[in-house]
Amino acid sequence: MTNNRKSFYALLGIPPKHKLDEKSDWASRTFDPEHKYVTSPIFRNPFIFGGLRIIVALYILITTIIFLEEYVSQGNGDSYLSYFTNLTYIGLCAYFFASGVQTICYALRWRRNGAGAGYPLQQSWPRFLQGLHVILYSTVITFPFIVTIVYWALLGGPHVWETTWSSWNAVSVHILNAFFAACELVFTNSPPVPWITLPVTILLLGSYLGVAYITYETQGFYTYSFLDPSEDGSGKLLPAYVIGIAVGQCILFTVVHFIAVLRQKLAAKYKRVIVLDEGRKAKRRKGKARGGKAKAKDAEEGGGRG
């Protein structure tokens, strides 16, 4: 009786380890064989695509440093990492830097060796880091939308536009965050988020509750008013808020997954997906084999006529 259960790595789209002398299909033993995480259906030149990712990462990094300095100057530096908004923003920065560097590395190899040259995360990095990259990607294209929706539905208001500083903060952290996530979803060839990462993202959201209540016990305030179980906060509605956010994440995750599926189909239809050198080499090998057989046949026929 065969065991058809897939490992956690396999569910993330990461192939199992293969021995050096083991014969198997190239794609089946390679992470991201079609280089989807480092290519775009819109920006065909990977240098441009990688550069745009780095620019986004630099903007997020600069704004993060400036906002953190403001927290520190107001004596609130120790609470900066207590906010889910800030944690998500830092996650965006980390992802765009990581993906940007990988894309630039791919572009350099692409220039030397062609489109199927690969990139470091794909070819030489351990499966553990490949898995973390997939999980980080799953949070990057879902959590910013949760942050933006919750903020403008429950927390934001006219007061955020009272000063230039607060307006810039609101735009950068609560609007552009979702815009960057949407761009990553629509303008890249990254595959649909694996379903196995849905419970992982729910677990991360649940874990944040621990951060929020540890912050209350150690610093004496609730990071978000709806997490306050007292009558001054959300009161009896607290479970509804928590469950609602979890359900919202499930719905959002599903929507994001199928948007990526649709984008992949459109990219394939309009031939916006790179044809890998590996495939070209296979075709050339088949062509040479057929050519060799034809030459041998002609030689036999020529010998027979002689």
Where in this protein do the model-derived segments appear?
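Membrane-interface transmembrane-helix boundary segments in multi-pass integral membrane proteins
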Residues: 44-48, 219-257, 276-281
